[in-house]
Amino acid sequence: MEITTIDTKSKLKLNKEIFAYTYNEGLVHQAVVTFMNNARSGNSAQKTRSEVSGGGKKPWNQKGTGRARAGTIRSPLWRSGGVTFASKKRDYSQKLNKKMYKRALRSIISELCRTGNLMVVSDFQCDNHKTKDFLKKMNQMEISNALIIMSEVGENEYLGSRNLIDYDICDVTTIDPVSLLRFEKVVVTEAAIKKIEEQLQ
């Protein structure tokens, strides 16, 4: 299996086991859900009426005042009262076996290859850290929305792209299913292709 680099027009051999893998939609969905759940902090928390400080004494007599009956000043109906269905800290993390995660990444990369959304460049380097020059480089390649995968991310490439919503840049070790699916195109350097093959073998 071969792919043509978009800059030098040279042919690059690809490993069929990684770049022509059968697409498994269920596994990809599981990997995406697991990744997104593992990114959740789960720190949202409120206090119920029993946890809020104070409210032990009945504010006024049950009868005789003409006011509505009340048993505590920490009722959810009151200002400074507890929350009726208070959320609690929760661990959302899920486990996904390494083999399953690798197969999911193979499925996504292979599907990108089949649909023509995986593009290979011989090398990707920026002369400086200016966002303007980074955009100019991407416009020359006619790519308006992409994830760029490099073997190692240089400082110029990182600084030039970090303020742009339509582009993201990462190295091979930090590839994740959500980023691969989020962008229209995935641009990979030749050096990164070799590392991907080693990593997903």
Swiss-Prot record:
One of the primary rRNA binding proteins, this protein initially binds near the 5'-end of the 23S rRNA. It is important during the early stages of 50S assembly. It makes multiple contacts with different domains of the 23S rRNA in the assembled 50S subunit and ribosome. Forms part of the polypeptide exit tunnel. GO terms for biological process: translation. Residues 42-67 are annotated as: Disordered. One of its GO terms (molecular function) is structural constituent of ribosome. GO terms for cellular component: ribonucleoprotein complex; ribosome. The gene is rplD. The keyword RNA-binding applies. Transmembrane segments: none annotated. Gene3D superfamilies: 3.40.1370.10. Pfam families: Ribosomal_L4 (PF00573). InterPro entries: Ribosomal_uL4, Ribosomal_uL4-like, Ribosomal_uL4_dom_sf. This is Large ribosomal subunit protein uL4. NCBIfam families: rplD_bact. Part of the 50S ribosomal subunit. Keywords: Ribonucleoprotein, Ribosomal protein, RNA-binding, rRNA-binding. Belongs to the universal ribosomal protein uL4 family.
